[in-house]
Amino acid sequence: MSATLPAARPAYRPQAAGVTAGRPADRVPTDGMPVTMVPVMTRPTTLGELRLAGWESVPVAEELRRNAVARIRSGEPMFPTVLGYEDTVIPQLENALLAGHDVIFLGERGQAKTRLIRSLTGLLDEWMPIVAGSEINDDPYGPVSRYARDLVAEMGDDTELGWVHRDDRYGEKLATPDTSIADLIGEVDPIRVAEGRYLSDELTLHYGLVPRTNRGLFCINELPDLSERIQVGLLNVLEERDIQIRGHRIRLPLDVVMFASANPEDYTNRGRIITPLKDRFGSQIRTHYPLDPDVEMDIVEQEATIPVVDGLSVVVPEFMSRVVVAISHEARRSPHLNQRSGVSVRMSIANQEALAASAVRRAVRSGETVAVPRVSDLDALAASMAGKVEIDSIDDDRDGEILDRIVRAALLGVFREVVPGELHRGVVEAFEEHDGVSVGEAVGSGAYAEVAAGIPALTTAVTVLLGDESDGGDPPAALVASAVELVLEGLHLSKRLNKETTGRGSRYRIRA
């Protein structure tokens, strides 16, 4: 490993009280810690220079605690990209970090467990010195591997250093049934033995993922899927903080904070976490889906990838995003779905993307320059929803009917929320003197705008529904079309209008 790093990386942060170093001027601080701009060239390259710089070695748990306290004290959000946990999960995680605990996150799929864990690297110091060439990030002040011990003993203060960025101090393993002790802890390297080394030589060891994350954070995802005999191999890591490899008479002390994630159903369906291992995790934190639809809308806006097409503007009105989120919340309440499996936020994200894609396809085909999702585009959600829910139904033919019922319930709920009830009667009465309105993929946005202009009550409802969407001016015809469809479909679901579906479109009429 090289003793120097590219100048684009920020300088190290000494730990001694009153001694600070910082990042280059083109790097914006992200951890809320006070920094002083110091040239990258001042970073020590030898053990002797490191001692003179006043750097102090601290355990990883203490490093997390210190930086978490600084983040809390500064008032910055601990995990700015994780939304909806500010009053529930994050306070528990902050307590666990301050207590120096290993943590297991328990929750259904799509609850940001892995994202939370990966975000913890932001609480590590930007740079960490190691003995150059070490496979397990040996501390220059207290090396533990045979290689690093011998090197420091031979070179003393002239021992060369390497610097590891915080992002490289995180290790992760997805637990699978074929995961072995060699993968996690280590094994004797037969190639090194073939080169002439003795089996008793510690240098023949090939370290696994856990020791290679020494002085860092290690996460095991889907922990119950790890076979029980392999889970036993982690007991020493969590309690005694050491590992033993094969028949070698070594106990390699490690400085690593362990994290794990698991789904609640895994305890009974696919596997279990052995009791001694659960007992060794200091904190167990239960995650959850967003409790507030507005928070889930923010998550969808943050995560969804909306298609970008030259010459086409894509606008997703707030009421359609609200319908997308309402579908997920309705699904989480449905007795026809397996709630133990959960309804992931990923479904909301995928539905938003599918809805926007359907609008883009329609706009490109019709030659329009603005693409806005409509209620009729919700048919595209069948594909994005199908793999993200588990339906508890003996009759597979009812799957489509159940999902359609969920979508209709979500639509009706949003309609009642965003369109005031006093506006409903005026639109219905106007339809008594109107032949009806046709909607669908083949109907251009201009036709909807003409319909709205010809029915004053509908124009009023559309204006109220769009609110700030029009930015104070006349809204685009595509936006009006989306609002018209929501109003008409809402009145139909409220049993105020009839809907006749034929081919690629539908027609709304007054109820007989």
PLM segments and residue spans:
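Phosphate-binding P-loop
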Residues: 85-86, 94-100, 108-109, 210-213, ...
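Hydrophobic positions on the alpha1 helix immediately C-terminal to the Walker A/P-loop
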Residues: 116, 120
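Canonical AAA+ ATPase core
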Residues: 124-162, 167-209, 214-312, 354-366
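Conserved glycine(s) of the Walker
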Residues: 112-113
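Dynamic helix-loop-helix/coil hinge segments at AAA+ ATPase domain boundaries and subdomain interfaces
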Residues: 54-59, 70-89
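Interdomain "pre-motor" coupling segment immediately N-terminal to P-loop NTPase/helicase cores
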Residues: 34-68
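C-terminal engagement/docking regions of AAA+ P-loop ATPases
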Residues: 340, 360-512
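Conserved C-terminal "switch" segment of AAA+ ATPases
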Residues: 54-66, 268-272, 278-341, 363-367, ...
